[in-house]
């Protein structure tokens, strides 16, 4: 089902079927050179919100800020000054407090005689709430294309808040991933090498914040953020990362600290409360009596090292061997994903949600949680046997091997941490929260999944978003569009938890919640290779409560 987004359906100011253009910064009324990185807000509660900007000056400076109840700034409700300098990369981050619950506000900054563009923000509501609109975004890779989905989110009047579940930046060098294509469209990474130092991470964050579509979204909607892996390095765990080499890149602890410092400087997120560190980066937001959203920290505080399939490729000769791999490694007891502190905060959030009588409990989930095994794609005739080809695609070799032994698709996701997943489901059930809605990023694919624990008991549903620009796994691996679509269909057919998936399009998920129902719209971009694009509704699912719990159903 494909339908074009129009003014009446979602995107304000867009005629039916019309193309949109993410305009250059100067054409969109962006800030002057002093505020070249735009303005942003985020991490709100009922009476406060974080306001952010960065000033492009050569020496320490004092920056004024204003928060108003009107767009003309005639009714200033909060104002102040913030001193910034090179010790924080000239970023400005203030907590505007003493605000009204559910309030709508405008904000701006002033430095060296220059006033920034204004942004719009809001606080969390208290009490009765009839509707909530959230955009689910993930995997925004500057070098892989234009952030058209950000531009669409900025224009989308159904969106109240933006949840970004990680990979807000990417750490790789330009030539590590389609470098020639990145240069062709003017999207080479800065710096061009893989980032390792604090200066590197700051430079990369700065580049991403200069993007006009990113600036439009951040100025229009408050950001609710959590991180995944690429904010630091590919596939980290507590003791290192798959993409970190201590011999050439130094101590992992130093690199991780640099990435986290830059993240907190450049993102509109609160500093940790008493007794917490920046690494303990998880949040809970309460939306009146309608919903609670909790995010997870799954990379730095507790995660066990990922299972590596490579040593098993010669060791597995039977399905019994494959099940031994799952039993002894993937499902090994004690392989954590979440820290005890994060788990305790989740239980507290769910308990409070139930006490408020909220119908919805959401999880901002950095990586897929549904059980997803690879079908035997060679036996199904979807791809040829790599052994019969002189130069098979590397992805085809890996896919054929996983499919032959019916193995989990991504061992870096919850599929590689079966004990931790069962622990989370049991924890939710004990709190009366067996109807969770997981809002998931990481995979670069759209997903609609029904979840169950190891005993088959319903555990909620999962809505997964594709990348803002990061391409889907199959299409990026060299499979053509027809084969990629067949692989999507085979995954859904093979896995009881997968209702539908799509790896062909970049985009975001719009989730609209009301008291008795929800609607998830998978919004796709027809291209990320040009700033001129068309956004359309690729698929829709209603969230309804049935006899077996929370269900996803295509609207009639």
Model region roles, listed by residue range:
Residues 2-7, 11-20, 28-556:
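Metal-dependent phosphoester/phosphodiester hydrolase catalytic core
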